[in-house]
């Protein structure tokens, strides 16, 4: 019972990845800059697709969902890391830790399934173009995206509930910059071997099964492209699919390396570096990859800048919504700082 009380009443200590030496301070602000670029890039991508009616297609709807997931993913981990670094505090409550685990696992899992849906969408568009409007109509596309969110959230709920069931009787220092599930397994007093097997199976479902769909889809796409008689058609198909393949390679490469290995093989330093790439760099690169290689997205962005034919109200809507998102981010970022200042004032 004492252990259970400790589980709910004590905070965890996030050791983080930066100290206050000049090199680490520079790296911290570099990561913070990457976070802001990722936040703005994914916000712009979501808003462009929402506001520009020419982008209201299944492919761009799925892309907007990917950007939304990336946006939520970086907001799950980086603001708390930044607050702890700037305030000098390293603690996080049990509820906060479970919340991070739930959103991190849910969003990561949802992205896995969504990337598989996006690969299937490209397969239908290239291999069955005449049936595309029937096989990928808005209703079917919406259902696939919804199931991606649901399946990812299911895994997040499993991990969050499991965290509450663990007892933590020893050290509460998490060798990471956020609450990640493998790091908590190491701290638990319970025998976690059975649960590690369950997590491994969940990872197989979340990672390997979507990868199989992606490989099967693009194998058919490659065969279809090879048999295309038009060089222009091949170039267009390659351009359409290459952006998605680059994102898949970055995302699944880091995820497979991170979660398929046994817990005993995890190195704290190695895990931190992979997590930085997985949670911050990839969300920053995704909108850049899709926008730089996509004429429709580039056209929509140029329309916003007023360098093309545009609807007069479009820029105004974008700026208002983007400002609202940025204000929301700042509110989240400084929420804990205000509480800290109030406590210090009272003391």
Swiss-Prot record:
Q: Which InterPro entries match?
A: GPCR_Rhodpsn, GPCR_Rhodpsn_7TM, Olfact_rcpt
Q: Where in the cell is it found?
A: Cell membrane
- The residue spans the entry assigns to the Extracellular side of the membrane are as follows 1-25, 80-100, 159-195, 260-272
Disulfide bridge partners, by residue number: 97-189
Spell out the molecular function terms from Gene Ontology.
Answer: G protein-coupled receptor activity; olfactory receptor activity
Q: Keyword set for this entry?
A: Cell membrane, Disulfide bond, G-protein coupled receptor, Glycoprotein, Membrane, Olfaction, Receptor, Sensory transduction, Transducer, Transmembrane, Transmembrane helix
Which ranges does the record mark as transmembrane? 26-49, 58-79, 101-120, 140-158, 196-219, 237-259, 273-292
- Gene3D superfamilies in the cross-refs: Rhodopsin 7-helix transmembrane proteins (1.20.1070.10)
Cytoplasmic compartment spans: 50-57, 121-139, 220-236, 293-347
Q: Which residues are glycosylated?
A: 5, 190
Q: Which GO terms describe its cellular component?
A: plasma membrane
Membrane protein topology class: Multi-pass membrane protein
In its UniProt record, which GO terms are filed under biological process?
detection of chemical stimulus involved in sensory perception of smell
Please tell me where this protein is predominantly located: membrane
Q: Which family does it belong to?
A: Belongs to the G-protein coupled receptor 1 family.
What biological function has been recorded for the protein in this entry?
Odorant receptor.
Q: What is this protein called?
A: Olfactory receptor 2M2
Species whose genome carries this gene = Homo sapiens (Human)
């Amino acid at each position: 019972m004492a252990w259970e009380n400790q589980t709910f009443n004590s905070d965890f200590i996030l050791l983080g990845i930066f100290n206050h030496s000049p090199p680490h301070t520079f790296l911290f602000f570099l990561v913070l800059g990457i976070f802001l670029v990722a936040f703005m890039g994914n916000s712009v991508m979501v808003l462009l697709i929402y506001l520009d009616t020419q982008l209201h297609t299944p492919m761009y709807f799925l892309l907007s969902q990917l950007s939304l997931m990336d946006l939520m993913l970086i907001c799950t981990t980086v603001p708390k890391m930044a607050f702890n670094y700037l305030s000098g505090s390293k603690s996080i409550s049990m509820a906060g830790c479970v919340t991070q685990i739930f959103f991190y696992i849910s969003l990561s899992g949802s992205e896995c399934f969504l990337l598989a849906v996006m690969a299937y969408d490209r397969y239908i568009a290239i291999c069955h173009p005449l049936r595309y409007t029937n096989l990928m109509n808005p209703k079917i596309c919406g259902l696939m995206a919804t199931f991606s969110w649901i399946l990812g959230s299911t895994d997040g709920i499993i991990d969050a509930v499991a965290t509450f069931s663990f007892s933590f009787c020893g050290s509460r220092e998490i060798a990471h910059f956020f609450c990640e599930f493998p790091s908590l397994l190491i701290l638990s007093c319970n025998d976690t071997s059975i649960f590690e097997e369950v997590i491994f199976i969940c990872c197989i479902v979340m990672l390997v099964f979507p990868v199989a769909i992606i490989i099967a889809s693009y194998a058919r796409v490659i065969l279809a492209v090879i048999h295309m008689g038009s060089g222009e058609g091949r170039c267009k198909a390659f351009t359409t699919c290459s952006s998605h393949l680059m994102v898949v390679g970055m995302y699944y490469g880091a995820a497979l390396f991170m979660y398929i290995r046994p817990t005993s093989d995890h190195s704290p330093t190695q895990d931190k570096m992979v997590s930085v790439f997985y949670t911050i760099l990839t969300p920053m690169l995704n909108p850049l990859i899709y926008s730089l290689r996509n004429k429709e997205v580039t056209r929509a962005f140029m329309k916003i800048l007023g360098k093309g034919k545009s609807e007069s109200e479009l820029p105004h809507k974008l700026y208002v919504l983007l400002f609202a998102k940025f204000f929301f981010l700042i509110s989240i970022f400084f929420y804990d700082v205000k509480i800290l200042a109030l406590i210090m004032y009272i003391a």
